[in-house]
Amino acid sequence: MTGLNLVITIIQDRLHMPLVSVIIPAYNAEDYISQCLSSVLSQTLSDIEVIVVDDGSTDRTASIVEELTHRDGRIRLIRQENQCAGVARNKGMEVAEGKYLYFLDADDWIEPDSLEKLCSSAESLGSDIVVARSEGFDNQTGETWLIDYALNGVPFDTLIRPSFYVDRLFQRFMGWPWDKLYRAEFIQSSGLLFQPLRTTNDAYFVFCSLMLAGGVSCVDKVLFHHRANNRKSLEGTRSKSWHCAIEAMWAIAKKIAEQPESTRLMESYNNWVLNYSYWSLNTLPADIADLYLEELAPALSAMPNGIESYVSRHEWTLRTLASLNQSKLLVKATDLSGDRENLSHEIANLQAEIARLNGELDSLRGELADRDSKIREVYSSHSYKLGHALLTPLSAVKHRGK
C-alpha cells in the first residue's frame, strides 16, 4: 500500500460513522468488565464503537480494557479522575460518533442480538428511543428474574407517541438507561446530559428524554442482564449519597414545569416520587431515612389531597402519612392501631358466625341424607314392589279408557 493509499484508508476510517456507540462508565469493575465487553464485542451487529470511560478505578479495570483495545480496534479507553458515572457517560457522549447511543453498566451484559434488535426497531419505526425487556441477576445467589415492572402496559413493535404515555410516563418506564437505545441526533438537539451525582445520576436524563422524544418503540424480548446485589456497586452505599435522589427529583420537576403537558406529567411524577421514596425509606438506615423525609417535605406538601390524583390507594396513603408531622402521625398510628383491633374483633365474630352457619348446613345435609335413605328403603321394600305390581295393570287400563 502506497503512502497516499494509506492516508486515504485512514481518512475513510475516520469518516465512517458507526451505527451504534456503546458507552460504558467503569469504576473498579475488574471482576465483571471482561464479561461485559465480551457480550458487546460478540454482537451480531458489528458496526459499533465501544467507548469505555474509566472513572478513576483503583483496581485493574483500566488495564484490562487497555489490553482488549489491542485485540479489537472498536474499543476506545478514556480515563478520568473519579467523578461518578454520570460525568463518565457525558464524556463518552462527547466523543461518540454513532448514529445511536447505548449506555451499558460495566457489571452488566447483553444478549448477542441486542443491538441488532434495537437498531432494527429504531430504523423501521423512526424511534428516538427504543426500550426492551431486561432480566435481573443476583450476584450473591445466582438467581435470575424478569424485571416485569418495566414496560408496564405499553404496546410492542409500534411507534408510541408521548401522548399515549404522558400521564403514566414514570410508571410505564424505569429511570435507568441500560434498557434503552437513543438516537444520537435527538439527544444532541435536546441538550440533555447526565447529572454529576454520585448515585441516581441517570434518572433526570432518562425521564426527560422520554418527555421530549418524538416517538418510542418497545421490543418484547429480554435483551439485557442487570447485576443486582453487587457489593462493589455504589448502589450498595446509598446511605452516603441519599440526597442525590432528592436532587434528581427537583431537577426533573423543574423540567416538567417547562412542558406543555406539565399537569399530566406532574401527576405521574408525584406517584413515582412516592413509590421511590417508600423504597428509600424502607432501605435506608432510620436516621438517614428521617433526613430524607425532611428534605422531601416541600414536595409532599405540594401534592394534591384527593385520592383521584394517585395511581392507587397505596400512593395516596403514602402521601397522607408522609405529610403528617410527628404528633399527627402518632395520633394517626394510634387510631389505625385501634381500627386494626376493632377489625380483628369483627373478623373473629364473622369467623364464629361462619362456623355456626357451616354447622347448620352440615345438620341440614344430614337430615336430607336421612330422608333420601328412608325413601330408598321404601322403594326397595316388598310391600312397595307388590303394590306397584298390582297397580300397574290398572293404570294401563285407565289410560286406554281415556
Question: What is each PLM-predicted segment?
Answer:
Residues P18-S21, E49, Y204:
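Cell-envelope/extracellular polymer assembly enzymes that use nucleotide-activated donors
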Residues A29-S42:
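Short, well-formed alpha-helical segments that are part of the catalytic scaffolds
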Residues S39, D54-S63, E81-N82:
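A conserved acidic beta->alpha catalytic loop
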Residues D47-G56, R76-E81, A106:
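Short beta-strand/loop segment that forms part of the nucleotide-sugar
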Residues Q80-A96:
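Glycine-rich, basic loop-to-helix element that forms the pyrophosphate-binding segment
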Residues A85-A88, A106-V219, F224-S241:
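Donor-binding/catalytic cores of nucleotide-activated saccharide
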Residues L101:
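Short aromatic/hydrophobic "clamp" motif used to bind/position activated sugar donors
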Residues T320-K402:
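Boundary detector for helix-to-coil junctions that initiate low-complexity/charged tails
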